[in-house]
């Protein structure tokens, strides 16, 4: 199949026009079109939430003493496994 000079020129023109239609990677138009970088959120726990472990994990005596101070309970223990970034033992009162 032999291409004529006109078909080669038309093909070249189409390819050149599509290359010019897309903005360059670092042009101001492409930078504006990008989404802004995500802002890192910081979370500060309220003062009451920091104290809710009652010694779990690590000090079951704090948990036991906490439960003894609650009316109707004889004591307490740390219940559940410690899984990093997922969960930690909680103070269970009996």
From Swiss-Prot:
Beta-D-GlcNAc-(1->4)-Mur2Ac(oyl-L-Ala-gamma-D-Glu-L-Lys-D-Ala-D-Ala)-di-trans,octa-cis-undecaprenyl diphosphate binds at residues 54-56, 66, 91. GO terms for biological process: defense response to bacterium; immune system process. The keyword Membrane applies. GO terms for cellular component: extracellular region; membrane; other organism cell membrane. Residues 1-25 form the signal peptide. Keywords: Antibiotic, Antimicrobial, Cleavage on pair of basic residues, Defensin, Disulfide bond, Immunity, Innate immunity, Lipid-binding, Membrane, Secreted, Signal, Target cell membrane, Target membrane. Residues 26-56 form a propeptide. This is Fungal defensin scedosporisin-2. Antibacterial peptide potently active against Gram-positive bacteria. May act by selectively inhibiting peptidoglycan biosynthesis through complex formation with the cell wall precursor lipid II (1:1 molar ratio) thus inhibiting cell wall synthesis. Shows remarkably activity against resistant isolates such as methicillin-resistant Staphylococcus aureus (MRSA) and vancomycin-resistant Enterococci (VRE) at the concentration of micromolar level. Does not act by destroying the membrane integrity, which is consistent with its nonamphiphilic architecture. Acts more rapidly than vancomycin. It is found in: Secreted; Target cell membrane. Gene3D superfamilies: Knottin, scorpion toxin-like (3.30.30.10). One of its GO terms (molecular function) is lipid binding. It holds the Pfam family Defensin_2. The keyword Ribonucleoprotein does not apply. Disulfide bonds join 56-78, 63-91, 67-93. Its main location: secreted. It comes from Pseudallescheria apiosperma. Has the structural arrangement of an alpha-helix connected to a beta-sheet by disulfide bonds (CSalpha/beta). Belongs to the invertebrate defensin family.
